[in-house]
A protein has these predicted regions:
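FMN-binding flavodoxin-like domain, especially the glycine-rich phosphate-binding loop
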Residues: 1-2, 6-14, 18-34, 38-147
Length: 147
């Protein structure tokens, strides 16, 4: 299972690429919130991945709010848990923050990754440089393949 949040499509793309590579299903966080589903059960032997954007070097509010209400149950003992943060400029302490926040609900990540893509927060960054954006997208895709 890969839990993801994507406001612009980047994280959905990353989650889909990982899911395709390891034959996992993706679960949009927005749907869990909309359905008020705050309990997740991960069957024994299934991986648990999380793909999130970096917001101001931290986690999105929708995820932090969800984790305050969530119960995540890993059945059995055979799980590989990982977290992927996408970012455009700097990912700051998002990986250690993810480890801390998910630790509060009993999840310890085996691996933490950061993949750089185009920074798409338009009030702060100039997005019209097609060549720069193309290079950033290629970089993000290459980093996603490594993950």
């Amino acid at each position: 299972m890969i839990l993801y949040f994507s406001a612009t499509g980047t994280n959905k793309y990353v989650a889909e690429q990982i899911a395709k590579a390891i034959d996992e299903k993706i679960v949009p966080l927005k749907e869990l919130v909309r359905q008020k589903k705050y309990s997740i059960t991960v069957p024994e032997g299934e991986n648990f991945g999380v793909v999130m954007p970096t917001y101001w070097e931290g986690l999105p509010a929708i995820l932090l709010d969800y984790l305050q209400k969530a119960e995540i149950l890993l059945e059995g003992a055979d799980h590989y848990c990982y977290f992927v943060a996408t970012y455009g400029c700097d990912y700051g302490n998002v990986l250690s923050t993810a480890q801390k926040e998910f630790g509060k609900v009993g999840i310890q990540f085996d691996s933490l990754y950061a993949a750089r893509f185009v920074d798409n927060w338009s009030p702060m960054f100039y997005l019209k440089n097609a060549e720069r954006n193309r290079r950033a997208e290629e970089n993000g895709e290459a980093e996603t393949r490594i993950i």
